[in-house]
């Protein structure tokens, strides 16, 4: 077993060796390096064929028509293109958007930008377990609501929203429904031929493909229109200009192909490892599970250890690559906005750790992690005056701290 142990697969994944090997064939002179938009010679045709194959592989994993897949630079761009693109195109119908407080920043910050441009956004607060109350969603829908954006799997706590029912609700009212599926694609079954989802964002690097490539699903029947955010050569049926990065697209396609083949067995394995991890630490005093194991992705476990400062815990766990909050926001020392939205106090939110498991995680690594967490929590609490006061029965909420 090699240290440190990587348990931050929700931040990014290593590229699968099979994917890397495939990508190498699309870079150099003796490979397929052409521009897929070059229509006048074989180099371009071969590149275009490689892109077509990858587009099919991605469509097959999610039950889409390959013509509904638009390549982007990643899920952040896909979220921007979907939300801004739909809002701008349909703004004559209305200017009201609904999303949730626990969405990824790529969705929340895009909505904030649209608010500056005159749109109105309703931010739904989830229930204590992170799931959106569908009655609240229904109550928020208005005649001028044009777009709902609710993610599939939350990147911090792993809860799974009921995108099938939300899709039915939106379709019945003629509202466009966008889903950020970055954390769920290849981990949970997605069948867009059955789901009433109009726009869906995907990433390459959360599923053992390369960074810098993603896709947006744009439904054809009923046809969804979006306004391009990037202008140029009119690539990707006018929705996203820019020369297609063939090697990255091929890598994403191969990653999605592998995911389709291995998803069922891999998810059962990861669910077992996640449960093993939780069972190994759940009897520590004052430990709380954030999210919902039953309605949760099989690979994410978010846990709060009360009376332990999260950053000091991460330092103590230096042999484990884990995160507090998500990588996209961990540059700030603010407690996780996702956990705050669940109604958690700052102290508990600060003491939370996200463990996310993946394809190369082993049972041996999980057992090592359990042992290390138990020892570290014990050691840090021995040093903590708060823990001592708690053990003496002092109500810490009633204490007035002196300001020196």
Swiss-Prot record:
Cell compartments where the protein resides: Cytoplasm
Family matches, as InterPro entries: Aminotrans_V_dom (IPR000192), Aminotrans_V_PyrdxlP_BS (IPR020578), Cys_deSase_IscS (IPR010240), Cysteine_dSase (IPR016454), PyrdxlP-dep_Trfase (IPR015424), PyrdxlP-dep_Trfase_major (IPR015421), PyrdxlP-dep_Trfase_small (IPR015422)
Gene3D superfamilies per the UniProt record, alphabetical: Aspartate Aminotransferase, domain 1, Type I PLP-dependent aspartate aminotransferase-like (Major domain)
Signal peptide range: none
UniProt: [2Fe-2S] cluster binding residues: 328
Active site as annotated: 328
Pathway the protein acts in: Cofactor biosynthesis; iron-sulfur cluster biosynthesis
Superkingdom: Bacteria
UniProt keywords, alphabetically: 2Fe-2S, Cytoplasm, Iron, Iron-sulfur, Metal-binding, Pyridoxal phosphate, Transferase
Record field: catalytic activity: (sulfur carrier)-H + L-cysteine = (sulfur carrier)-SH + L-alanine
GO molecular function terms attached to this record: 2 iron, 2 sulfur cluster binding; cysteine desulfurase activity; metal ion binding; pyridoxal phosphate binding
Coiled coil feature spans: none
Annotated residues for binding of pyridoxal 5'-phosphate: 75-76, 155, 183, 203-205, 243
Top-level enzyme category: transferase
Subunit structure: Homodimer. Forms a heterotetramer with IscU, interacts with other sulfur acceptors.
Function: Master enzyme that delivers sulfur to a number of partners involved in Fe-S cluster assembly, tRNA modification or cofactor biosynthesis. Catalyzes the removal of elemental sulfur and selenium atoms from cysteine and selenocysteine to produce alanine. Functions as a sulfur delivery protein for Fe-S cluster synthesis onto IscU, an Fe-S scaffold assembly protein, as well as other S acceptor proteins. Also functions as a selenium delivery protein in the pathway for the biosynthesis of selenophosphate.
Name of protein: Cysteine desulfurase IscS
Gene coding for it: iscS
């Amino acid at each position: 077993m090699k240290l440190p142990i990587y348990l931050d697969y929700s931040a990014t994944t290593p590229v699968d060796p099979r994917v890397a090997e495939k990508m190498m064939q699309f870079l150099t002179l003796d490979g397929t390096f052409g521009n897929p938009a070059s229509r006048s010679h074989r180099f371009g045709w071969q590149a275009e064929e490689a892109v077509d194959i990858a587009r099919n592989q991605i469509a097959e994993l999610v039950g889409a028509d390959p013509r509904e897949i638009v390549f982007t630079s990643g899920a952040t761009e896909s979220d921007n293109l979907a939300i801004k693109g739909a809002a701008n195109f349909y703004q004559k119908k209305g200017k009201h958007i609904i999303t949730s407080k626990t969405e990824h920043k790529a969705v929340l910050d895009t909505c904030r930008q649209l608010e500056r441009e005159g749109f109105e956004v309703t931010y739904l607060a989830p229930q204590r377990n992170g799931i959106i109350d569908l009655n609240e969603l229904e109550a928020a829908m208005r005649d001028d609501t044009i777009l709902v954006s609710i993610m599939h799997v939350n990147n911090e706590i792993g809860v799974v929203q009921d995108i099938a029912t939300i899709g039915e609700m939106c379709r019945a009212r003629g509202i466009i429904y966008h889903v950020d599926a970055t954390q769920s694609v290849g981990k949970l079954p997605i069948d867009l031929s059955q789901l009433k989802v109009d726009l869906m964002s995907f990433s390459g690097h959360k599923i053992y493909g390369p960074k810098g490539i993603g896709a947006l699903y744009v439904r054809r029947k009923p046809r969804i229109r979006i306004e391009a955010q990037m202008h140029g050569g009119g690539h990707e049926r006018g929705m996203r200009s820019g020369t297609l990065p063939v090697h990255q697209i091929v890598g994403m396609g191969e990653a999605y192909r592998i995911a389709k083949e291995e998803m069922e067995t891999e998810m059962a394995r990861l669910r077992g490892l996640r449960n093993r991890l939780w069972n190994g630490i759940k009897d520590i005093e004052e430990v709380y599970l954030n999210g919902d194991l039953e309605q949760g992705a099989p690979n994410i476990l978010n846990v709060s250890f009360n009376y332990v400062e999260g950053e000091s815990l991460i330092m103590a766990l230096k042999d484990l690559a884990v995160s507090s909050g998500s990588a996209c926001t961990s540059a700030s020392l603010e407690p996780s906005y996702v956990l705050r939205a669940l109604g958690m106090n700052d102290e508990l939110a600060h003491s939370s750790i996200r463990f996310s498991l993946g394809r190369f995680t082993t049972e041996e690594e999980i057992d090592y992690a359990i042992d290390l967490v138990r020892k570290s929590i014990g050691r840090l609490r021995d040093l903590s005056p708060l823990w001592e006061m708690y053990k003496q029965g002092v109500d810490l909420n009633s204490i007035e701290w002196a300001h020196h």
